[in-house]
Structures are given as structure tokens and as C-alpha cells.
UniProtKB/Swiss-Prot annotation:
Function as written in the Swiss-Prot or TrEMBL entry: Catalyzes two activities which are involved in the cyclic version of arginine biosynthesis: the synthesis of N-acetylglutamate from glutamate and acetyl-CoA as the acetyl donor, and of ornithine by transacetylation between N(2)-acetylornithine and glutamate.
Tagged with keyword Transcription: no
Catalytic activity: N(2)-acetyl-L-ornithine + L-glutamate = N-acetyl-L-glutamate + L-ornithine; L-glutamate + acetyl-CoA = N-acetyl-L-glutamate + CoA + H(+)
Protein's recorded name: Arginine biosynthesis bifunctional protein ArgJ
Top-level division of the source organism's lineage: Bacteria
Matches recorded under SUPFAM superfamilies: DmpA/ArgJ-like (SSF56266)
Residues annotated as the enzyme's active site: 199
Family membership noted in the UniProt record: Belongs to the ArgJ family.
GO molecular function per UniProt: glutamate N-acetyltransferase activity; L-glutamate N-acetyltransferase activity
Subcellular localization: Cytoplasm
Site entry (Cleavage), positions: 198-199
InterPro entries found in the cross-reference section: Arg_biosynth_ArgJ, ArgJ-like_dom_sf, ArgJ_beta_C
One biological process term in Gene Ontology: ornithine biosynthetic process
Organism name: Staphylococcus saprophyticus subsp. saprophyticus (strain ATCC 15305 / DSM 20229 / NCIMB 8711 / NCTC 7292 / S-41)
């Protein structure tokens, strides 16, 4: 799958599933093992050869981790970053003043190593909550950032992982003003995933020339439709965020909402965010199936999103999917408690393109055919809930015995 390069001819998008955050002009990514984990790469970086316009979206969890708060404050100074540092294994969350000082020290060491201003360094951590970082190991790692033998983007893609079973990355190219613009993305996430930013880190880079306000708007719109529409287990974490850097090294007229081809950039960014979000959902802890829920006919898009999230978050729906059980009553129940604007007599539900509910009433269907469809590793649930114009899609996974095993022994 990752060796495929495709072209979306309709939208003039070149898609490289081997690409990542190092694909756009002027970006370098790398990683190394500094001893936070037993053997695996655990410290990574993204560096732009020139300062980049930057924006981010952050967890809604009230226990925000120190590195997240520091990065948010740093970006707010002048909407720019030049480097991002990430460690896995330890979240540096619920660590008080020492945790914040550790994040500040990491930021300062990187700024000195790269000879850049301190506020241009973003810091991110992911892993076990409540443990302090071994700062001697972190300092060692910062002294090796950008050394040639470690500047391998796949090392960065690996360094940010926790319980993930695979790396998640791609890049896309689109023509703007006759110039090739590249957007690259790398993400991590497998458990503690729920809408409105959860246990996931997402990093997006681009060589596009785009003003800060437009970049911020585009990223937030894309995340509302992608990262905020995935769930694995309903838990939202303390650390996690999506950061986007645009260094402007592609030579084209600056993009803003009035640019005649700005829709191309928006489409490309949406594609990257959706691909990464679905990759996280598919790699949910213990997951065996990707679940896609599409809702239409809702009162508005807000209600459509609530209903789609309700279905994909339901543990009863998730366990039925895992058991390949055509128990559509669980889907109907999740629709019914999600919104007060549901029109039961105008509600239709299909499971794997097999109609199971029409006008609010169960219908006969081919049980054997549906059983065969449910054996697939990609499950589609579609629901029309009325005659409104609201549409939305959400992504999740099944809930398996393996999920319990992984999370019962996470610290051990």
C-alpha cells in the first residue's frame, strides 16, 4: 500500500504514500534512540531551513501537558516555528513546574543547537502520563539533532509512535500559479482517541507561501472534518495536537482566500488530514476493521457530526462490528440518542450497502450476504436521518479483546 503513487486527476493532485513531513522543499526530519524506550527510536525532529508560518490545534482536555502549553504559547508570539521536537514513551503531563521547566530546557537546548530563536521551537511529547523526563537523555538527544546520520525521515515517523502498529504518513503535490506546491504529513495515534483532539500527534509541513491567518483557518476547517471526526475508545488525552508549518519556499503568489487557486490548497490539505485521520482510526489498539459512518439528511452539519460521532463511538456498535453481527438496532439506538432533530419516519440505514431500515422500520435483508460483507476489514454504515441538508462522515474501528489486553498492561 505505501509504495503506491497515484494521481487524483479530477483535482490535479499527485499523491505519494511514501512521502512525509520531509517531502516539501526546505524541510528535514530525523530521529534517534536516546534511551526513553528499550530499543526503538524515541526522539525525533522536523526542521525548516527558513522560519515557517505556523499554526496548531490542541487538545480540549483540561489537563494540558507542559510541552503542549509551551508550544501553543510559542506559536502565539509571532505565528512561526522553525523546528519541532518530539519524544515518545513519556508524556510529560501532570508533572507540574518541573515538567514545564523540562520542556523549556528542551526548547532552549534545541534553539542553541540549531542557532535559532527559542520561541521558534515547538515541543511535543507522548507516552505515559505522570512520569518525569530523564533530562540527561533528552539533552544528549538534542546535541545530535540534524547530524547527518540521523536525518532520515522514517526515523522521525517511528520516533513519535507509542502503541501504534504502523507509521502514518504521506505527501501530495498540487500546481498553484504553475508552481508545484507540496504538503507532507506524519501522525501517530492508536489508543485514547476521541473527537476534538485526542491521543494523537499530527505534523503537517508545506512549502506553500500562505499568510498566517489563512493557514490557521484552513487547518482548523480541515481538522473539524477529519481528526475531530475519529474515535477509537472515547478517551481524550492531555498532550495532543496537530501542528502545521508553511515555509513559503515554493515560488508562487501568496495564498489567501482571494487567490484564484486557493481551493486547490484547501483540497490538498483536506486530503492529507483525512488520510492521516483514517490511518489512525484503522490502527486503533487491537482493531481489525476500519469503520466509516456517513450521515445525511440531518438538520445541519453540526447535528450530522453529532450523529456520525455517536454511531462510531458506540461500544455496542463497535463490538457488533468486531463480531460481524448484523445487529442494526445498535446503530438505530445510537442515532436516536444523538440528536433531538431526528425524523424516525424519514430515517434509512444501510450496513455495508445492505438496507436494514427504511422509513424507521426494519426491512428484510439477506443475512448471509451481510454476514459476508461484515467479514471485510472496511465497514461502511450509512444513515439518512431526515430531509435536512446536513452531512458528515466519521471514522473509527471495532472493539476487540486485544484492546483490553493492550490497555490492561500498558505501563508494564
Amino acid at each position: 500500500m505505501r509504495d503506491i503513487e497515484t494521481i487524483d486527476t479530477l483535482n490535479q493532485l499527485n499523491i505519494d504514500l511514501q512521502g512525509d513531513v520531509s517531502s516539501p522543499l526546505g524541510f528535514i526530519a530525523g530521529g534517534l534512540h536516546c534511551g526513553l524506550r528499550r530499543k526503538k527510536v524515541d526522539f525525533g525532529w522536523i526542521y525548516s531551513t527558513t522560519p515557517a508560518t505556523a499554526t496548531g490545534v490542541y487538545t480540549l482536555n483540561q489537563f494540558k501537558a507542559a510541552p503542549l502549553k509551551l508550544t501553543e504559547d510559542s506559536i502565539n508570539k509571532d505565528k512561526a516555528l522553525q523546528a519541532i521536537i518530539v519524544n515518545s514513551a513519556i508524556a510529560n503531563a501532570c508533572t507540574g513546574e518541573k515538567g514545564m521547566q523540562d520542556a523549556l530546557d528542551t526548547q532552549a537546548w534545541i534553539a542553541e543547537q540549531l542557532n535559532i530563536e527559542q520561541h521558534l521551537v515547538g515541543v511535543a511529547s507522548t507516552g505515559v502520563i505522570g512520569s518525569f523526563l530523564p533530562m540527561d537523555k533528552i539533552q544528549y538527544a538534542t546535541q545530535h539533532v540534524l547530524k547527518e546520520q540521523y536525518n532520515k525521515s522514517e526515523a522521525f515517523n517511528q520516533a513519535i509512535l507509542t502503541t501504534d502498529t504502523m507509521t502514518k504518513h504521506l505527501s501530495v503535490k498540487v500546481e498553484i500559479d504553475g508552481t508545484t506546491v507540496t504538503i507532507g504529513g506524519t501522525a501517530k495515534g492508536s489508543g485514547m482517541i476521541h473527537p476534538n483532539m485526542a491521543t494523537m500527534l499530527g505534523f503537517i509541513t508545506t512549502d506553500a507561501n500562505i499568510d498566517a491567518n489563512t493557514l490557521d483557518y484552513c487547518l482548523k476547517q480541515s481538522i473539524d472534518q477529519s481528526f475531530n471526526m475519529i474515535t477509537v475508545d472515547g478517551d481524550s488525552s492531555t498532550n495532543d495536537m496537530v501542528l502545521c508549518m508553511a515555509n513559503g519556499q515554493a515560488q508562487h503568489t501568496q495564498i489567501d482566500a482571494l487567490h484564484p487557486e486557493w481551493h486547490k490548497f484547501v483540497y490538498a490539505l483536506n486530503f492529507v488530514c483525512h488520510y492521516l485521520a483514517k490511518s489512525i482510526a484503522k490502527d486503533g489498539e487491537g482493531a481489525t476493521k476500519l469503520v466509516t459512518v456517513k450521515v445525511k439528511g440531518a438538520h445541519d452539519v453540526v447535528e450530522a457530526r453529532k450523529i456520525a460521532k455517536s454511531i462510531v463511538s458506540s461500544n455496542l456498535v463497535k463490538t457488533a462490528v468486531h463480531g460481524e453481527d448484523a445487529n442494526f438496532g445498535r446503530i438505530v439506538t445510537a442515532i436516536g440518542y444523538a440528536s433531538r432533530y431526528i425524523e424516525p419516519s424519514a430515517t434509512h440505514v444501510s450496513l455495508c450497502q445492505v438496507s436494514v431500515l427504511e422509513k424507521g422500520m426494519a426491512v428484510d435483508f439477506d443475512e448471509q450476504r451481510l454476514k459476508e460483507e461484515l467479514a471485510s476489514d472496511n465497514i461502511l454504515i450509512e444513515a439518512t436521518v431526515g430531509n435536512g441538508e446536513g452531512e458528515a462522515a466519521a471514522y473509527g474501528c471495532d472493539l476487540s479483546y486485544e484492546y483490553v489486553r493492550i490497555n490492561a498492561s500498558y505501563r508494564t
